[in-house]
């Protein structure tokens, strides 16, 4: 399984047990969105859940080997660092899989 950042067209590195997407420094009220792709074999049954309401994930099945997920951090009106998680549950080749994506960054003036 691969998770690819569509903005940079690069594979997201896995750190121990999770994938990390660093939004970096964001300006206050800036839109913080990133679309990623999960690539694998016979992907199905995707569900996603965020650890708080300030993080949103919108999955879309492209084909049996590709799922796209738009990730959004919605609290950019607050100037502070953030580190949120999105949990993905799905099956690859009929085997259950779980992937955790950390979304982090810093909102500044």
Can you annotate each of these PLM segments?
Residues 1, 36-38, 46-48, 67-71, ...:
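Hydrophobic beta-strand residues in large extracellular and virion-surface proteins
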Residues 28-35, 76-87:
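Short, solvent-exposed loop/turn segments enriched in Ser/Thr/Gly
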